[in-house]
Amino acid sequence: EAGKDCDCGSPANPCCDAATCKLLPGAQCGEGPCCDQCSFMKKGTICRRARGDDLDDYCNGRSAGCPRNPFHA
């Protein structure tokens, strides 16, 4: 949602200020398949295993989301 950096529904998220929905100082991310302990996972970390003829998807080191490989079946 606009103006929100993270999901502020739970005060238990150690990366997010539940009152403002903003990431805490030093946090890169609050959740996502490529977010680990408030930091982006390193480039090349598998975030989605291949299925069928598809290939594995990897974190890019710059976001918390898991980008689809360009050869997605």
Swiss-Prot record:
Subcellular location per the Swiss-Prot or TrEMBL entry: Secreted
This protein's major location comes to secreted
GO MF terms held by the record: toxin activity
What is known about the tissue distribution of this protein?
Answer: Expressed by the venom gland.
Give one Pfam family, short name only. Answer: Disintegrin
Q: Where is this motif: Cell attachment site?
A: 51-53
Q: Note the SS bond partners.
A: 6-21, 8-16, 15-38, 29-35, 34-59, 47-66
UniProt-listed SUPFAM superfamilies: Blood coagulation inhibitor (disintegrin)
Keywords carried by this UniProt record: Cell adhesion impairing toxin, Disulfide bond, Hemostasis impairing toxin, Platelet aggregation inhibiting toxin, Secreted, Toxin
SMART domains linked: DISIN
Among InterPro entries, the record links this protein to:
Disintegrin_CS, Disintegrin_dom, Disintegrin_dom_sf
One GO term describing the cellular component? extracellular region
Q: Does the keyword Metal-binding apply?
A: no
What range does the record give for the signal peptide? none
Ranges of residues in domain Disintegrin: 1-73
This molecule's function is given as:
Inhibits fibrinogen interaction with platelets. Acts by binding to the alpha-IIb/beta-3 receptor (ITGA2B/ITGB3) on the platelet surface and inhibits aggregation induced by ADP, thrombin, platelet-activating factor and collagen.
Subunit structure comment from the entry: Monomer (disintegrin).
Q: Anything else of interest in the record?
A: The disintegrin belongs to the medium disintegrin subfamily.
- Family per record: Belongs to the venom metalloproteinase (M12B) family. P-II subfamily. P-IIa sub-subfamily.
Q: What is this protein called?
A: Disintegrin trigramin-beta-2
